């Protein structure tokens, strides 16, 4: 018979998931920056790469609070989102719609991360892991801010540029 799993186990499992996801995102962001056509898009992806490194470090602190080694668990969701981004980079390379596609991929990543961090914060509170909350909240706040920046970039530059080319 399987051993009973608890919210603590689910928290650790989800922490491993987002840790893996952040590491994959860290690898994908330079490719997205190189593919972006606008300078603002390139700089945005590079800035988020630097933020992502800080987010990984905060996640490592949460692992330390748990007395566990920082270790990821394959996150198929993020692998799928990154694969879609790579598809967009291939299919729309050199077109006016590329940046709009890259932004939409980046926002899919952000929304996944926002969902994960929100859940982890709620669970950390529930299991009494109060010292993890500010670390996770800092990551959530950065993800939400990035999502807002991406929306602004899409609405003011990338989407109109993609539409004009039609």
Where would I find each of the regions flagged by the language model?
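Amphipathic alpha-helical hairpins
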Residues: 1-166
């Amino acid at each position: 018979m399987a051993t009973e799993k608890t919210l603590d186990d689910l928290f650790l499992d989800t922490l491993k998931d987002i840790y893996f996801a952040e590491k994959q995102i860290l690898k994908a962001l330079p490719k997205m920056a190189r593919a972006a056509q606008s300078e603002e898009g390139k700089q945005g992806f590079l800035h988020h790469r630097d933020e992502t490194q800080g987010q990984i470090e905060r996640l490592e602190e949460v692992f330390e609070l748990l007395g566990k080694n920082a270790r990821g668990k394959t996150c198929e969701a993020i692998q799928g989102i990154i694969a879609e981004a790579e598809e967009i980079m291939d299919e729309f390379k050199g077109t006016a719609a590329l940046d709009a596609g890259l932004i939409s991929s980046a926002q899919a990543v952000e929304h996944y991360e926002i969902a994960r961090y929100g859940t982890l914060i709620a669970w950390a509170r529930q299991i009494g892991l109060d010292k993890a909350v500010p670390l996770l909240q800092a990551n959530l706040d950065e993800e939400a801010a990035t999502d807002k920046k991406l929306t602004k970039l899409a609405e003011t530059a990338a989407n109109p540029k993609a539409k004009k080319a039609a």
